[in-house]
Design a protein with these regions (language model features):
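Bacterial N-terminal signal peptides that target proteins for export
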Residues: 1-8
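C-terminal motif of bacterial Sec signal peptides marking the signal peptidase cleavage site
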Residues: 17-19
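Short, low-complexity N-terminal intrinsically disordered segments enriched in polar/charged residues
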Residues: 21-66, 71, 158-189, 197-200, ...
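A structural feature that tracks compact, well-ordered secondary-structure segments
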Residues: 47-48, 57-60, 70, 80-83, ...
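Solvent-exposed loop/turn segments at secondary-structure junctions
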Residues: 78, 84-86, 125-127, 154-157
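Surface-exposed, charged secondary-structure patches
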Residues: 92-135, 185-223, 246-253
Length: 253
């Protein structure tokens, strides 16, 4: 994976995931995120997406994870589960809010030149302590708000060893987490954007690809025979297509 236009956010927390252990909204203050990511061109502001994920997390903690997920979902949103990609409204409508929601934190944001489409990648931990990765696609609506269009997650295999419990007097080194903000290049007037690299055509219902309206960001998913949930995002940067996110996620227990 090539990292371009990497932007760092400093925050005092043991790790991105630990900082978010009681809700997705824990992490760098919004003011810090906005200040560091404000150099993005035009309407494509990664900080807007990070702030939206924090808002979503706060709602999940206060209203319930399923209730919040339904409220923040775009029309026609999809969830990628162990049985494949399903309609979010139907899937969420049959579920109840867990007593404790997952905790998660954003690690990367890739956004189209016009700022209408964004893909986030991050880490999560469920109430049982299982940790893994997630990917969410956000689409800007007519009123300017962002709603999620696609969501998938999967655990680390194998799981990392349990974190050591610290005792009084131990010296703990504080880590500085970072959020990568990747913004697609805006073409010059009259410049044609080349098509993204060709991809194999998957079986109907088991693979799909989407291209942003301005042609600078593509994301796609596959549900593979072994149950692996594959998702990737490519963006147009400095005259070439670059893979920003690529995940092969195992089924959740």
């Amino acid at each position: 994976m090539k990292a371009r236009s990497t932007l760092l956010i400093a925050a005092v927390c043991a790790s991105t995931l630990t900082a978010c252990s009681s809700g997705r909204d824990r992490g760098p203050p919004i003011q810090v995120i906005n200040r560091v990511l404000a150099t993005a061109p035009g309407a494509a502001q990664p900080s807007t997406i990070v702030a939206r994920e924090i808002e979503f997390a706060r709602a999940a903690r206060e209203e319930g994870q399923i209730t919040a997920a339904a409220r923040f979902a775009a029309p026609g949103a999809k969830v990628h589960r162990e049985g494949g990609v399903k309609d979010a409204a139907a899937a969420l409508g049959s579920e109840k809010n867990p007593d404790i929601s997952d905790a998660w934190g954003t690690a990367a944001v890739v956004i189209s030149c016009d700022g209408r489409l964004a893909v986030t990648q991050g880490r999560y931990r469920d109430p049982q302590g299982i940790v893994g990765d997630y990917v969410t696609v956000w689409q800007r609506q007519r009123d300017g708000t962002f709603l999620w269009q696609y969501d998938v997650s999967g655990p680390d295999v194998p799981q990392p060893p349990p974190r050591r419990e610290f005792e009084d007097g131990d010296i703990v080194v504080i880590a500085i987490p970072s959020i990568r903000g990747l913004v697609a290049s805006c073409p010059d007037r009259g410049e044609a954007i080349p098509a993204p690299p060709a991809i194999p055509i998957g079986e109907e219902g088991k693979a799909e690809a989407w291209l942003s309206r301005d042609g600078t960001l593509r994301w796609r998913w596959e549900h593979r025979e072994d149950g692996i949930k594959f998702v990737a995002a490519d963006y147009y940067y400095n005259g070439e297509w670059v893979t920003a996110i690529e995940e092969s996620l195992a089924p959740r227990p």
